[in-house]
A protein has these predicted regions:
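Transmembrane alpha-helices and adjacent helix-loop boundaries
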Residues: 1-227
C-alpha cells in the first residue's frame, strides 16, 4: 500500500509539473508576448520540452500498443517507425526537419522553424516513450490480461482499466528520466539556428556590455539544468 501511494504521488507530481508548464506557456505568465519567430532563451526551452512531454507520451503509448498488435501492417509500421527514429541522433532529425523537409514541399510553402523543431523533438521523444511503455506492459503478468478478458472487458477496456494503471508504476522512473534527458537535449536546437537558454547565455557572454560579467548567467543556467 505504501509503495502504491508513492507511485501515485510521483504520478500526480509529474502531471502537475506538466500542467504548470502548459499553463505558463498558454497564459504567457509574467513574460512579454513574443512572436514565435523571435522566441528564445528559457521560454524556448520550456516550449520545446513541454510539447515533447505532452505529445511524446500519448504517441509513445500508441506506438507501443501498435508494436504489440496482432495486425501485421500496424506492427510492421510501428516497429519500423520506432527503430528508425531511435537509431538516428536527435541532431540529425533536427537537421532533416529544418533543412531537408522544406526541399520536398511545394514551391512557396513555408513552415515556422519552431514548429519543425517541435515536431522533430516530439517524434524523437515518442519513440523512446514507446519502448518505455512496452517494457512496462511486458512486466505485467499474462494472468492480468486473462482476468480482464474473463470478466468481459474488451481490448481497450482491459488496457485502460486493468493493464495500463499497473504498468504505469513500472514506467514512471524511466519516463521521468527520459523527460529530464529531453529537457537537456533542447540545447541541440542551437545547431539549427535557434537560441535556447544555453545558446542565449553564450551569446550574452560574447556581447561587449557583458564582457567580464558572464559568470552569473552561466551559473544560473547550470542551476536550472541541475534542478
Amino acid at each position: 500500500i505504501f509503495a502504491e501511494k508513492q507511485h501515485t504521488y510521483a504520478l500526480t507530481g509529474l502531471f502537475s509539473i506538466i500542467a504548470v508548464i502548459l499553463a505558463l506557456l498558454i497564459q504567457d505568465w509574467i513574460l512579454v508576448e513574443v512572436n514565435w519567430v523571435r522566441m528564445g532563451g528559457f521560454h524556448l526551452t520550456l516550449v520545446i520540452s513541454g510539447f515533447a512531454m505532452v505529445v511524446g507520451l500519448p504517441c509513445g503509448i500508441i506506438l507501443a500498443l501498435g508494436r504489440r498488435s496482432q495486425l501485421p501492417v500496424i506492427k510492421a509500421f510501428s516497429v519500423t517507425f520506432i527503430e528508425v527514429f531511435r537509431s538516428v541522433p536527435l541532431i540529425t532529425i533536427l537537421f532533416m526537419a529544418t533543412a531537408m523537409f522544406p526541399l520536398f514541399m511545394p514551391e512557396g510553402f513555408e513552415l515556422n522553424k519552431l514548429v519543425q523543431v517541435i515536431a522533430a523533438v516530439c517524434l524523437f521523444t515518442s519513440c523512446y516513450m514507446a519502448e518505455i511503455v512496452r517494457s512496462g506492459l511486458q512486466a505485467i503478468p499474462k494472468g492480468q490480461f486473462e482476468a480482464a478478458s474473463s470478466i468481459g472487458l474488451g481490448y481497450w477496456q482491459s488496457m485502460g482499466l486493468v493493464v495500463m494503471p499497473q504498468a504505469l508504476k513500472f514506467m514512471i522512473p524511466n519516463i521521468v528520466s527520459s523527460f529530464i534527458g529531453i529537457f537537456k537535449d533542447t540545447t541541440l536546437v542551437y545547431i539549427v539556428g535557434m537560441f535556447d537558454i544555453l545558446a542565449m547565455t553564450r551569446a550574452m557572454s560574447n556581447d561587449v556590455p557583458w564582457r567580464g560579467e558572464f559568470h552569473e548567467p552561466f551559473l544560473m543556467t547550470a542551476i536550472i539544468f541541475f534542478v
